[in-house]
Amino acid sequence: MTGLSLALANLKPGTGKTTSAVWLAHVFAQAGTSVLLVDADPSGSALEWSDLAAMYPGLAPEQAAFPFRIVALPSRELHRRLPEIAKHDDVVIIDTPQIEDHAGIARSALRYADEILIPCAPSPIEINRTTPVRDEIAEVREVRDKPVRSAVLLNRCVARAHSTTDAREALVDLGYDVLSTVVPRREVYAQSFGVPIKHAGCDVWRQVARDLIERCAPLCGVRSRARSESGSCARRRWRPRRAGGPSPTRARRARPRSGPSRSGSPWT
């Protein structure tokens, strides 16, 4: 029985869904869990990445291959077919297609996953585009027979930039849960497609994995310190603050997590 099922979702392509899915699958697998990565995007980016990585020059196939299973399932019936396919896996991660072009497939993935992660850069346009994703999640809740949680993963963040803190405040004010860890803008991530995962970039993704485990404790049987997703979601849009002006939101500033955890868990 799957312990954690996660879908990466967004309205548009190019938001970091595939990158997030592959790196997360890698760190979960490195921690000793059985991982299934589901490529639900008709473009097959995750599967292509896997194929290219396995042929990486200078490495034997067994060294270059991803340390987890990957299957292609771009289907509107994903939520019906995946339980049998994933019945022996501890973690299932679904790389969904962009909702604007493949809504049926994306909805099927949202019906299956217990946690929905929305990758989002700290920019006004990307924050505003999370609203249709939230609307899809709300519709899916009506037809599910078990709870679903959702959170935003801030990615492509510039170190010490105010935009990251402003984006977190705006998202919280809009009613979202935002993971404590942010993914910085690094070349190791931007240039990682088609090559084996480099351990030098895994530190951040281990922290993201810890955040997810804490959030999903009620579903996965792991102790959680994450807050509940209760409360309403205001249907507002974010406007960036003017230079020198006050923040447009009243949410408390949350400092992004940095540095490795000292908990002694496999995610450190």
Residue ranges and their predicted role:
Residues 2-15, 22-103, 107, 193-198:
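P-loop/Walker-type NTP enzyme "switch/lid" segment
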Residues 36-37, 94, 118, 152-154:
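Structural beta-sheet core signal
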Residues 104-124:
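Inter-motif core of Ras-like GTPase G domains
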Residues 130-145:
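Conserved C-terminal guanine-recognition region of P-loop GTPase G domains, centered on the G4
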Residues 156-161, 165-197:
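Beta-strand-loop-alpha "switch" segments that mediate conformational coupling across diverse proteins
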Residues 187-209, 213:
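Inter-lobe coupling/hinge region of RecA-like P-loop helicase motors
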Residues 235-268:
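Long, low-complexity, intrinsically disordered segments
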